[in-house]
């Protein structure tokens, strides 16, 4: 089932309608018709999330940037084929998952060090939050790097990207029961370390 763009046509006629206020579904409809402004808005909304996800998967800043470019190029070209079975953000992360896997197969030998990954900051944070985040982030990174890639990816999607089990299943191309199993084993492994704490 594709998105119904009928409402998008009505909203397009609205005088003074700001692209930044529109829903992701509306933006996809507009992008499918070649609207570059809507593509810019979609990119601005989601590029950081996609980049961080790609960076966690690839552990390489340059490779993650390439993945982001490929994701949004794919979104531009494939907007007309978007199926409304999931949120646009879930669709973008699923594309990122596949593009990152492809990129890793091409460049298996390069990884981002744990120190570099922990140094990634959110520009919205204040100095205290940055310090606290770095401290916790370093400890958490140590634990997460010990997890198998499939478990690490599921933890990343659920806790960092706030995706549901069903959305994670769509992104990684697995059954929901498989995602739950990976979550269980990841939590069990993290619980075994003295560094893991429940929020």
What is each PLM-predicted segment?
Residues 32-33, 59, 70-87, 106-107, ...:
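Sigma70-family region 2
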Residues 63, 178, 185:
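Residues in the helix-turn-helix
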Residues 154-158:
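A short pre-motif secondary-structure segment
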